[in-house]
Design a protein with these regions (language model features):
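Secondary-structure boundary elements
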Residues: 1-4, 59-61
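C-terminal terminal-subdomain/extension
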Residues: 2, 88-160
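Mixed-charge, Lys/Arg-rich low-complexity intrinsically disordered regions
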Residues: 2-25
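Compact nucleic-acid interaction/catalytic patches
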Residues: 41-94
Length: 160
């Protein structure tokens, strides 16, 4: 049989590719993508977007969006104290992508990316790591116990 040179990606429709990619995204997966105001990320120095690491917390009940928290190198000193307290340190000794420095998950700022947008930004090199189930439980706890959390949003993504 002659090989046509087509890949699975060539054969699948855009909708099918989106479904395959989105269904492969799991709680605890870490990605690095160029995010913008659509995901609640503000650019720096005149840029409209920023490359950010983030950890997936879940899919919404309709399968249309992914919930996530941003992972930062430091806690923004301009945040209110209540939000600073909801940053969970993740240890570089557990995760190679941190390159020897502990980073922080901002559990006070639950963000959403549409499935369509995620697929649009996705490539296999964007996947960086998997956060341990112990750390995911800590992240969820911090998010749930944040007094200003959007309860409706947390419920939509299965945290409540």
């Amino acid at each position: 049989m002659k090989h046509s040179g087509n890949t699975i990606g060539d054969i699948l429709s855009e909708k099918m590719k989106a479904e395959v990619i989105a269904s492969a995204v799991n709680e605890g997966d870490v990605y690095r993508m160029c995010l913008d105001e659509r995901e609640g990320i503000i650019g720096k120095n005149g840029a409209e977007s920023r490359n950010k690491y983030f950890v997936i917390i879940g899919h919404d009940s309709d399968g249309n969006a992914l919930g996530f928290f941003v992972i930062d190198t430091e806690i923004n000193r301009n945040l209110p104290e209540i939000r600073k307290q909801k940053h969970l340190r993740i240890e570089s000794s557990k995760y190679d992508f941190l390159n020897g420095t502990d980073w922080y998950v901002d559990c006070s700022d639950f963000k959403i990316i549409s499935k369509h947008r995620f697929v649009e930004l996705f490539s296999s090199d964007k996947a960086k790591a998997k956060i341990s189930s112990d750390d995911i439980e800590k992240i969820k706890h911090e998010a749930i116990t944040y007094r200003n959390a959007n309860r409706k949003m947390l419920k939509r993504f299965g945290l409540l």
